[in-house]
Amino acid sequence: MFSAAMLARRATTATKAHARALSSNLGCFPGTKMPFVPEMVFRDPRDDDLIPCSRILNEEGDIVEGAQDPELGRDICTQIYSNMIRLNTMDNIFYDAQRQGRISFYMTSYGEEAISFGSAAALRLSDMVFAQYREPGVLMWRGFTLQNFADQCFGNKEGHGKGRQMPVHYGSKSLNYQTISSPLATQLPQAAGAAYAFKLAKEDRIAVSYFGEGAASEGDFHAALNFASTKDCPILYFCRNNGFAISTPTVDQFRGDGIASRGSGYGIPIMRVDGNDFLAVYEATRRAREFILQENRPVLIEAMSYRQGHHSTSDDSTQYRAVAEIKHWKETCDPIDRTKRYLIKRGWLTEEQDRHMQDNERTNVLAALQQAEAVGPPDLDTMFEDVYDVKPPHLIVRLSALFFCYAKLTES
């Protein structure tokens, strides 16, 4: 509740502002200012200029004219590339493992590797990540190992999810990466709330919420951006616009200039970036983080990309797009190939080193897969853990009943 004195001060301030606006022919309605005009004209957003797409690196691995190389240095750039190879190799092998019936479900990140690693490299480990399901690269960059990924996908007793989560619902408390949820867009308002808490606690960190353009069609997207804007939350909303929401292309999802334009409607600074250019993604994220902490305001980045893989192992994308289209994007705009060309031209990578790196990652992924497969499932009694500090009586009864039924079944 506001005190009478506070309400009186607000009323006085509002009255004076309204009087000043009227004297200068401005409409000072609550919450906004705009000029009065005599014309009665509809504004058509199709007449406005499109938001440009920023890039630093072209498809050939060259710095584009007028752009400035952020000069990340050899170590960071080669680390980004090696992580791209690791994720791509893991995707290949884990996808095949699902087809062989060894794991139940999987989702790849083909074509979106630069988004994950370019942005992750510009964040701090203290920044809290609220991801969707296409950002395992962010978690990998933070230190989640191949064995961690494999254990989670097999749902074994070593996995952080203890066999209770879907395979690709990764998470890590120690790495500040919130566990993924199946429902789309739930992470967006959660991230806004976390960012608001950081602000109240005066912590020097931000929240980062990744999502696809399909998730931006959910109501949670709008609620989250409105909350983040009105509360001036230190949060980066990072949209991966990869062209498809499962089988629905963007042309059937929305009208208007993509997702970035929606940020303007909520008073949020925006940037659109080439999501296949790891340097541009890095620099956009770095600048966004710096702005967010300095201005205490949210930022929305839209990274344009193309989903080269199927939505998941439950999908066959050739039913709604041509194989030739996928092949074209793979051959002309692949982010891994672009990064490789840049490194070779800088003298930081050779073809021989690249082959050795790929062979080494394949060996490591296969070893992690085999080790995870050899580990047994979680014990039955773990189903009743991690909710209560001390098990209540009714759960103890149910646990006993479970073991009784299990014993009966195994006897027969």
Feature map (PLM): residue ranges:
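Cofactor-binding active-site loop characterized by glycine-rich and histidine/acidic residues
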Residues: 89-92, 96-231, 252-255, 260, ...
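C-terminal intrinsically disordered, low-complexity extensions immediately downstream
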Residues: 374-412
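A short structural micro-motif
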Residues: 87, 125, 360-367, 389-393
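N-terminal amphipathic, basic-rich helices that act as targeting or association modules
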Residues: 2, 6-7, 11-134, 375, ...
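Glycine-rich ThDP/TPP pyrophosphate-binding loop and its adjacent helix/strand module
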Residues: 177-374
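Surface-exposed helix-capping loop/turn segments at secondary-structure junctions
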Residues: 93-97, 348-351, 373-382
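A short, flexible beta-alpha/helix-coil linker loop
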Residues: 62-63, 136, 175, 242-245
